[in-house]
Amino acid sequence: MFTRVSVWARILLVLLVVAALVLVVCARHLWLAPFPKPRPDPPQEDVALAQAARDYFCAQEAVTTCDAQAGYWNNTGIMTTVDLRAETGAEEVIALLTGAEQELADEIAAAAASNVTVALSWKVGGLPLRMENQLGDNKHELARPALTLALTRAGTSARSVTLDRKHVEVDYEKHDTVPEDLDLQMPEDLQVPQSGGSGESSGEATLYYKQTFSSGKRSVELYLEPGQAIETTPINALLATEERSKYGSTLQAYGGESGLTRISVCELDGDQDHRLTSDETTGLIRAVADCNGLSALELATGSVASRTSVAAYVCTDSTLAVDREADYDQDLDPVLAQELLDAARA
């Protein structure tokens, strides 16, 4: 009997030792393992923009799958990204907000009423393509038109939405060209600038509507007046190229109260094969302005640091004249200038 008890005692002792060793190993592992820091939930007042963006975006009839991400500003002014896709369990956070569109517009208006930028990005032939719309001036609150412009145009091709108190950005999936359904005309909400209050006339402030298209080293910047529209064909022809050299070209069109007042074409000096041709330039000019409404056109060719040649084209009553700046006459490309003149007069 004594022997049997002794055997059981030894077995129990071994089990206790094994259990103790297991506890020691587990305790050591837990003690040495880094404790994960809990991710604090974003404050409701900071994530309101992101919640509203997703609610408004997902409410569009054209959206068949809601896979939106939105960003918000925290109290330190640092941009933070919050994943608002349905699979992440963020529905309970999103459900906290009602009247999403109005609250979002109010948030942006309160933080930055002077300027709202909408940026749309996609790819052309593997090259990144970006369109940027800068709306407003320091007398007009244009948050709601900016949101409508960005979110309602997203449709089913929108991949994500990034939003902060000054910018609304919609990332698109790959497109071959500028989306056909993208209306490049200024929204009707902005056709007539609102009064700035305090009795000022709406005509006292100039409204600029900037659209920037870029691909590789080539870009087109358009500053349109209310009601001014552009054709996408020459822009796509310019941007959808495989040009990847260090040289590039830029076209800028400026609009004012009376219409487009100046178009500048700037080409980086170097590789002639990668400069804008006269056909490309005149095609873009025709896309953004009628000759009768164009008061000045400047053509500049040169290096990044300094221009080597400049020609200014003035269009009045369908008559195009050339005004060459004296400092650059010796470097002006007469062939290109004449080609532009002939094409514009045709």
Please give the residue ranges for each predicted region.
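Terminal targeting segments of Actinobacterial cell-envelope proteins
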Residues: M1-A9
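Hydrophobic membrane-insertion alpha-helices, especially the h-region
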Residues: R10-H29
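Extracytoplasmic low-complexity, Pro/Thr/Ser/Ala/Gly-rich segments
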Residues: L30-E103, A143-G155, P234-K246, D333-A346
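Sec/Tat-exported extracytoplasmic proteins
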Residues: E61, L104-I108, Q194, L239-E243, ...
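Long, acidic/polar, low-complexity amphipathic helices and coiled-coil-like
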Residues: G77-L84, A90-S215
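Extracytoplasmic/luminal low-complexity segments enriched in Pro/Gly and acidic/polar residues
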Residues: E200-A346
